[in-house]
């Protein structure tokens, strides 16, 4: 989950931009930054929908148009759509705090639902393993009970046979 870029436009003119290009080398950063701006602006101009996504390999570009402002948000494909829409709503409310909003949404901890889902999956896996081990223990307990019953039957049979043998012999 990685947020690369947020661009804010007014009348299709770039007003403000915030990028995180830390995953790229020094000599690539300028070219990638220019490409992000160009690609976002082109999509914004050509789009007719108010909100749409374009996914290309490991990148997702989301264009959000409102009455006065438009936003371009570039993330990786793992970035959840619901977080992007929350980001869009927060930008609508106060786009002047782009730096703070960008830093807030760059943090993977912003996705509380995703974190809870991840913890639930881990808990589910642990519970499944525990239930499997309990079932295996139950199977071994069933085997032990069967063996105990067999041993009980064998001891009763042995006792009866020993009693018969002792009854035919007389002690002098």
Which positions does each model-derived feature cover?
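Soluble N-terminal interaction domains of secretory/endomembrane membrane proteins
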Residues: 1-133, 168-172
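Alpha-helical heptad-repeat coiled-coil segments that mediate oligomerization/polymerization in large
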Residues: 116, 127-130, 134-141, 148-151, ...
């Amino acid at each position: 989950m990685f947020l690369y870029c947020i661009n804010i436009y007014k009348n299709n003119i770039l007003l403000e931009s915030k990028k995180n290009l830390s995953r790229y080398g020094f000599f690539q950063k300028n070219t990638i930054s220019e490409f992000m701006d160009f690609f976002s602006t082109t999509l914004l101009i050509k789009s007719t929908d108010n909100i749409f996504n374009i996914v290309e390999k490991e990148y997702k570009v989301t264009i959000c148009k409102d009455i006065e402002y438009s936003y371009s948000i570039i993330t990786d494909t793992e970035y959840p759509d619901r977080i992007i829409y929350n980001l869009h709503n927060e930008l609508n409310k106060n786009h002047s705090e782009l730096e703070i909003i960008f830093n807030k949404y760059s943090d993977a901890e912003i996705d509380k639902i995703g974190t809870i889902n991840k913890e639930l999956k881990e808990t589910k896996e642990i519970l499944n393993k525990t239930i499997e081990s309990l079932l295996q223990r139950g199977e071994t307990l069933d085997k032990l009970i069967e063996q105990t019953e067999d041993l009980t039957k064998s001891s009763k049979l042995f006792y009866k046979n020993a009693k018969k043998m002792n009854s035919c012999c007389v002690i002098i």
